[in-house]
Every structure is written in C-alpha cells, then in structure tokens.
C-alpha cells in the first residue's frame, strides 16, 4: 500500500498572494511549495484539504467558533475520509512548515511505527485539556491524574495532550480513532451533546483557552486504546524555527521546521534572499 501527506489550507486555490489583501498569508506559497516538493521527492501523494471539502460540516459556520478552531476540527473529519482510501499511513503536516534539503523519507524513517506524535508539555494546555475531558466530554474520571511519571527521564508525561503539528498514523490506529470521533455530519450534534457548541473559553493559569482538535484527539485517546501504539516523534520532525536558525553556531539540525506564530512566518519572509537560511530548506 502507498502513503500520503496531508496539509490543511483554507485559502482559495487561486489566491493572489501579491494582492495586499493576502499580505498576512504571503508565507503560504513558500511553505506549500516546500511541502509539496518534499512529497514529490519521497514519491508519496500530496493532498491539500480544507473545510470546503466537507459539505456536511458547513453548519458549523452558524456557531461562534473562530476560523482557527473550525480549521483544526478538519484534523478530525479527514480521519474518516482517510479510511475510505487505500493508503497504509498518512503524515499530517501543519502548513507553516518548511523542509530541510537533507530530510529523509518520513515514512521509511518510521516504517515500523503506527503512531508517531510529540508530547504537548505546555502546562496550561494540559490543564485545559483535562478540564474538557473531565467536565465536558466526561471521558475520564474526575480523580484521574492526566500525567504519568517516566522513571527513566524523571519527568511527568501528559497522557492525553499530544502535539498535532506533525504526526503519522496507520490505518489500524485511525480505524480505532474514528470509532469514537464525530464525522462531518455528526460533529455539530457531538458538540451540542457535550455542551461545547457555545464555544466555552476557559481561564487556565492566566491564559484563555478554547476547544480545538487536540482536545478531540485527547477524547479519542481516552475512549480507545490507541496510545498503546504511540511513540514520541523526534524533535527534528517538528523543530521550532528559533533553534534551527537563530542560535548562530548553536543552530540545530532539523528535518521539518515549524514556523510557529506570526514571528515565524515573518522570519521566513524576511530571509527569502538570505542564503544562510534558504540553502538549508527546499522551497
């Protein structure tokens, strides 16, 4: 069976990025071409998906979710569509990524792995995830500790909060995930049934946090046994741009670089003619 790379992009396919109206998205074609070139290089299919690919999802626009939230829910909806294909595994990559010229084939690198994803250690996000799982989704007991202690690293590891910037899943994992997750036709009812349709915003450790894809994935981890397949994805596959480019001689090697936040996107635009940056990435 073959593999596929998915990227979510809700901008129009004919978007004119020279138009001032798209100024804030001027980074998109550079990242998109980097990811597409990588897919061609490793000879896998490359699919760009958006909210518009899910006609049954359009009712979501009647409710008070941000565009970002609605876009992240696509990471749940597409799992159902993946199961209708013949692909063996997928890698989902966030749009705001660029690929190193030295990056190996992500599927060959993880040929024996079914579920690769980084842990999400942000304390406020883990706490937010815990509240949604316990008080809204009723997926875990009120007294459950959402961390497990890793004796080897002497560190608390989140059970249900994983990082969705870059991840790999096999058909076996996805088949279990979709058995409990809503699809494009049921997600609105799912949100209603769990008192999430009014988009509650939580105050957690001084930060405002809302319900997104990570929380729905956490729900699936709690309701199934898929985490038995999970292995932590290495940092080089979801590296932050500061460590890749802004540490001088201490810059770290990477395979996929994540241009997180507005600063990350601006960094790329500011360095399109800088060989110290561009010689490292394929755009």
Briefly describe each language-model feature range.
Residues 71-137:
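GT-A fold catalytic core of metal-dependent nucleotide-sugar glycosyltransferases
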Residues 14-15, 55-58, 99-102, 107-108, ...:
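Short catalytic/ligand-binding loop motif for oxyanion handling, primarily in non-cytosolic enzymes
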Residues 136-158:
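Short, flexible, basic/aromatic active-site loop/helix in glycosyltransferases
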Residues 62-66, 130-136, 245-255, 272:
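Short, surface-exposed amphipathic charged segments that create phosphate/polyanion-binding patches used
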Residues 154-271:
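Catalytic core and acceptor-binding pocket of nucleotide-sugar-dependent glycosyltransferases
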Residues 7, 45-50, 91-94, 99, ...:
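A structural signal for short, well-ordered beta-strand segments and their strand-loop junctions
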Residues 1-77, 81-86, 257-264, 268, ...:
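N-terminal anchoring/stem segment of glycosyltransferases
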Residues 107, 131-139, 181-192:
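Short, surface-exposed, charged loop/turn segments at secondary-structure junctions
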């Amino acid at each position: 069976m073959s593999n596929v790379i998915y990227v979510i992009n809700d901008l129009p396919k004919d978007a004119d990025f020279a138009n001032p109206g798209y100024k804030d998205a001027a980074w998109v074609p550079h990242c998109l071409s980097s990811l597409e070139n990588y897919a061609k290089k490793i000879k896998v299919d490359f699919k760009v998906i958006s909210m518009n690919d899910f006609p049954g999802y359009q009712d979501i626009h009647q409710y008070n979710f941000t565009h970002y939230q609605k876009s992240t829910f696509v990471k749940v909806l597409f799992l159902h569509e993946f199961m209708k294909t013949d692909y063996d595994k997928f890698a989902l990559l966030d749009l705001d990524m660029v690929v190193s010229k030295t990056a190996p084939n992500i599927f060959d690198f993880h040929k024996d792995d079914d579920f690769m994803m980084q842990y999400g250690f942000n304390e406020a996000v883990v706490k937010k995830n815990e509240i949604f799982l316990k008080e809204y989704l009723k997926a875990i007991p009120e007294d459950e500790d959402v961390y497990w202690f890793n004796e080897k690293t002497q560190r608390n590891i989140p059970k249900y909060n994983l990082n969705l910037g870059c991840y790999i899943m096999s058909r076996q994992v996805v088949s279990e995930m979709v058995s409990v997750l809503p699809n494009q036709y049921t997600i609105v009812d799912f949100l209603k049934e769990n008192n999430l349709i009014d988009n509650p915003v939580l105050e957690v450790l001084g930060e405002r946090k809302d319900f997104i894809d990570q929380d729905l994935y956490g729900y699936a981890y709690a309701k199934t046994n898929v985490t038995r397949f999970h292995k932590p994805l290495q940092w080089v596959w979801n590296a932050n741009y500061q460590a890749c480019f802004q540490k001088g001689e201490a810059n770290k090697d990477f395979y996929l670089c994540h241009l997180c936040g507005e600063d990350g996107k601006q960094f790329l635009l500011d360095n399109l003619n800088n060989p110290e940056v561009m010689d490292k990435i394929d755009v």
